[in-house]
Amino acid sequence: MSIKILSESEIKQVANSYQAPAVLFANPKNLYQRRAKRLRDLAQNHPLSDYLLFAADIVESQLSTLEKNPLPPQQLEQLNTIEPLNAKTFKRNSIWREYLTEILDEIKPKANEQIAATIEFLEKASSAELEEMANKLLAQEFNLVSSDKAVFIWAALSLYWLQAAQQIPHNSQVENAENLHHCPVCGSLPVASMVQIGTSQGLRYLHCNLCESEWNLVRAQCTNCNSHDKLEMWSLNEELALVRAETCGSCESYLKMMFQEKDPYVEPVADDLASIFLDIEMEEKGFARSGLNPFIFPAEEA
């Protein structure tokens, strides 16, 4: 990995020099509030309004759980500086299962018949069964867990990882410009990338689908294979073009890119989900998605 999380001593060494941060860490409460509002706004007159509103309910349940049951201080001193919270190797606290229970309790009164059946299954699942499904998802074996269950399990895991990321040093530096297609904090996939405004004006940051951190990657470079060639931008509405798909002819993948200058309220997860018809268009052109939205998991293999 090419981005290193700095130790306390290293932070002091670079304290007097300013450079754009390699990693941006989320403000959990603000993130959930903005995402839920954006999902509800995008749901208006949208063909998939019911699912966007369901996603908003999940996000609001994450916020409620965060406020009622915050993650206690963890023993994180001996972590690696490269992917310190690696999703596949980091020993997670079982509190994530409490988060799952609380999220399910919040959603249950609003659930339709199909969602209620999923909730009932997860409520009856043993701790070992839940941990096994979590292990598969964190290992990116998404096809081994049904998508209806994955959404809830991932919501709980993400709430845990987001809070754990608040407890590690928040300074970082780029070691080199290679291998930036995974999150430098937890090693997970991006949802999409965002071209920012404000102090990071014009810089592109990829948004992690697990710990919600963002990391800088130069524009005009494939987010999957690092190629600078055969890159194209696509959109369904060229006039607005708030959300575009960047395709790479070298690896035949794509990832969406969003532009805060066109709408400061754009939100990676919400706007990615709401632009699912752009995904369909890209797949019809033969490109495979290189990222993952926490509300769109692949179908389980039979």
UniProtKB/Swiss-Prot annotation:
The keyword Cytoplasm applies. GO terms for cellular component: cytosol. The keyword Cytoplasm applies. One of its GO terms (biological process) is protein maturation. This is Protein FdhE homolog. The lineage of its organism: Bacteria, Pseudomonadati, Pseudomonadota, Gammaproteobacteria, Pasteurellales. InterPro entries: FdhE-like_sf, FdhE_C, FdhE_central, FdhE_N, Formate_DH_accessory. NCBIfam families: FdhE, PRK03564.1. Necessary for formate dehydrogenase activity. Keywords: Cytoplasm. One of its GO terms (molecular function) is ferric iron binding. PANTHER family: PROTEIN FDHE. Its main location: cytoplasm. Belongs to the FdhE family. HAMAP family: FdeH (MF_00611). It comes from Haemophilus influenzae (strain ATCC 51907 / DSM 11121 / KW20 / Rd). It is found in: Cytoplasm.
